[in-house]
Design a protein with these regions (language model features):
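Glycine-rich hexapeptide-repeat left-handed beta-helix
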Residues: 1-4, 37-45, 51-53, 62-67, ...
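Extended, small-residue-rich solenoid/repeat segments and analogous flexible loops
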Residues: 1-33, 37, 151-156
């Protein structure tokens, strides 16, 4: 069952189907696909799903995205959990059962294979993805700033 907050912005070409819950100030950008046809997809406040992303679930794995999350252009999230204040880089892929803890960055092009979990505050890069270091306070702050920038951009 769709539950879409009135302050959500869904741009032309984007598709939201199935059991999907979108909280306040979420933005779904051009040509993104959010398919909650197997299990539920929940996207938290102030999060943005950028152009050409694909969000999907499996029959065993729902998809949960926390608050202040930015999902970069053409990223794929499949049956995973993304906690608050995370940046998923462009063309990154996060697969079933994986869990990205809060205040983390998954770098552009990274492949997070099934059932992986990384510590809070990690920089996660590579194929297959691995945590290479902890983020600085400034880097963590930039994740929040980016999400807030997208909220403003979506209202123009």
């Amino acid at each position: 069952m769709k539950k879409i907050n009135p302050k959500v912005e869904i741009f032309p070409g984007a598709h939201v189907i199935g059991d999907v819950s979108l909280d306040e100030d979420v933005s779904i950008w051009y040509n993104a696909v959010v398919r909650g046809d197997n299990k539920q997809i929940v996207i938290g406040k102030n999060s943005n799903i950028q152009d050409n992303c694909v969000l999907h679930t499996s029959s065993e794995h729902p998809l949960k995205i926390g608050e202040n999350v930015s999902v970069g252009h053409a990223a794929v999230l499949h049956g995973c959990e993304i906690e608050d204040n995370v940046l998923i880089g462009m063309n990154a892929t996060v697969l079933n059962g994986s869990h990205i803890n809060k205040n983390s960055i998954v770098g552009a092009g990274a492949l997070v294979t099934e059932n992986k979990e990384f510590p809070e505050g990690s920089l996660i890069i590579g194929v297959p993805a691995r945590a290479v270091r902890q983020l600085s306070p400034e880097e963590i702050e930039s994740i929040t700033k980016n999400a807030k920038k997208y909220v403003k951009l979506s209202k123009k």
